[in-house]
Amino acid sequence: MATLRVQPEAQAKVDVFREDLCTKTENLLGSYFPKKISELDAFLKEPALNEANLSNLKAPLDIPVPDPVKEKEKGERKKQQEKEDKDEKKKGEDEDKGPPCGPVNCNEKILVLLQRLKPEIKDVIEQLNLVTTWLQLQIPRIEDGNNFGVAVQEKVFELMTSLHTKLEGFHTQISKYFSERGDAVTKAAKQPHVGDYRQLVHELDEAEYRDIRLMVMEIRNAYAVLYDIILKNFEKLKKPRGETKGMIY
């Protein structure tokens, strides 16, 4: 029978790591998770996340609307200049110039909420990773029979994987908001006479506000679901075959 020889000193280090991780995880489940559920539930009840009139979220766009007559004259002068000037390099430099307005800031109300949300996303992903590792360390040696507890472990692991995928997507979702808003602001600055582009900026802010509230709810629910399912099945997760088994080697 093939066996893997492990130095006692190396095994002792692994055992210390495992015991430390198990202690941390059980402390998380016993106190930290209930605390986070309560904190996030309180966050969801704050006025900042319960704005009934979303038009109050509107951020000022310091993009002046041009005078149509002056714009027409400017356009005619530009056409004349392009005919006279055949220097492609100069034309390229002109095209790279920014819009004729000052800097357009982010939506401060949305930014404040995101500054509170992002640490929560980071925290829940780290805690989920810790609990997932704990669960994997409880998996017994693969053998026939008495595998009901192992099946429970697999179901809980599937749930954790699904939660991790969803939570990881929040970072991409936030980045996408800034990218899309930046594009909308750029279009509004380049074509200030088109009201739809201005409105698009406000629509993106409102959509992100709703998404922020949903993300806070999802994080709270992730803590609650993990706490509940592990608490209900703790014995099966800890001792899937009714006794402590070693790690898979």
Curated annotation (Swiss-Prot):
Pfam name, any one: PA28_N
Describe what upregulates or represses it: By interferon gamma.
Q: Which GO terms describe its molecular function?
A: endopeptidase activator activity
Stretch list, region Disordered: 60-101
InterPro entries (UniProt xref): PA28_C (IPR003186), PA28_C_sf (IPR036997), PA28_N_sf (IPR036996), Proteasome_activ_PA28 (IPR009077), Proteasome_activ_PA28_N (IPR003185), Proteasome_activ_sf (IPR036252)
Q: Which PANTHER family has this protein been placed in? A: PROTEASOME ACTIVATOR COMPLEX SUBUNIT 1 (PTHR10660:SF5), PROTEASOME REGULATOR PA28 (PTHR10660)
Give the quaternary structure.
Heterodimer of PSME1 and PSME2, which forms a hexameric ring. PSME1 can form homoheptamers.
State what protein this is by name. Answer: Proteasome activator complex subunit 1
Q: What organism does the UniProt record list as the source?
A: Macaca fascicularis
* Lineage of the organism: Eukaryota, Metazoa, Chordata, Craniata, Vertebrata
Gene that specifies this protein: PSME1
